[in-house]
Amino acid sequence: MVLKTKENKKFDIYLKSSDFAVSKKASKLIKKLNKKHPKRKSLNSFEAKKYDIYFKEVCKAVTNGINNQLICNHINLKILPGEFVVILGKSGSGKTSLLSLISALDRPTSGDSFVCGTNTICCSDAKLTALRNKNVGYIFQQYGLLRDLDVDDNIKLALPLKKRFNNNLEELLERLELKEHRHKKVHKLSGGQQQRVAIARALIKEPKILFGDEPTGAVNIDISKKILQFFVEYNRDKGTTIVIVTHNEKIVELAKRVIKIHDGKIIVDYLNQNPKTIEQINWV
């Protein structure tokens, strides 16, 4: 979908100019779409505080300097504390763009977008960073570990210096079967062990929400099942909100809530009344 804006009309003039002028104008349009909005009172701020994520009519637009395109299209979404949510979509469906918004990695172009009670559309970059550091944990398909540091030090990197001694560390090492590897350099670990280190790093600060972007995409089925089992148990035991973004329809069967996205729109959103266990799912 293309948004027709005043900027688009003005841009026609620049198409007859030099390439430099076009590039300069395009840069300004991109900055305008991604800048923070002035503080404004939202009619939904009181209701939003009940949710970890509260989105109402949220849009995200990108530009090539000539046309603006919606990559997230009027998203309405409410996620309560403690939910286990799977967002399902094919490549190019907009699921990663949505993840960037609901995890406060990016600001929307319009709408009300509350993450842990904060309206992210009004936040400066510094405030978005503070919001993420306090409330959000991430697990990506690429682990982002420092290969020459050991397991302990990689995990502790997620903590402020004054909190490097953390009681949560021992529990995570135990639950993720990493205790015997804690002093090994991570480049000496298997792929599955490295993934578990990344999970521990995301959870060491005890975030309110854990986001996983294709968290099992780079490991085999056996390791995937162990990782997913950990998510299920952690959600049950700690009450941490977990949101997994994936193209794998098998993972949907574990979720308490399933959201499907296509062309930047939520097309399905339902509660799974009978989520399956790892053993009940046919992984073949």
Curated annotation (Swiss-Prot):
Against InterPro entries, the record matches this protein to: AAA+_ATPase, ABC_transporter-like_ATP-bd, ABC_transporter-like_CS, MacB-like_ATP-bd, P-loop_NTPase
Task: Name the PROSITE patterns on file.
Answer: ABC_TRANSPORTER_1, ABC_TRANSPORTER_2
- In which residues is ATP bound? 89-96
- Please give the SMART domains that the UniProt record associates with this protein: AAA
Annotated Gene Ontology MF terms? Answer: ATP binding; ATP hydrolysis activity
Under the heading CDD domains, the entry gives: ABC_MJ0796_LolCDE_FtsE
> Which keywords belong to this entry?
ATP-binding, Nucleotide-binding, Transport
Query: What residue stretches are annotated with the ABC transporter domain?
Result: 53-284
Q: Which domain of life is it from?
A: Bacteria
Family from the record: Belongs to the ABC transporter superfamily.
PANTHER family reported for this sequence: ABC TRANSPORTER ATP-BINDING PROTEIN MG467-RELATED, LIPOPROTEIN-RELEASING SYSTEM ATP-BINDING PROTEIN LOLD
What is the protein's given name? Putative ABC transporter ATP-binding protein MG468.1
- Annotated source species: Mycoplasma genitalium (strain ATCC 33530 / DSM 19775 / NCTC 10195 / G37) (Mycoplasmoides genitalium)
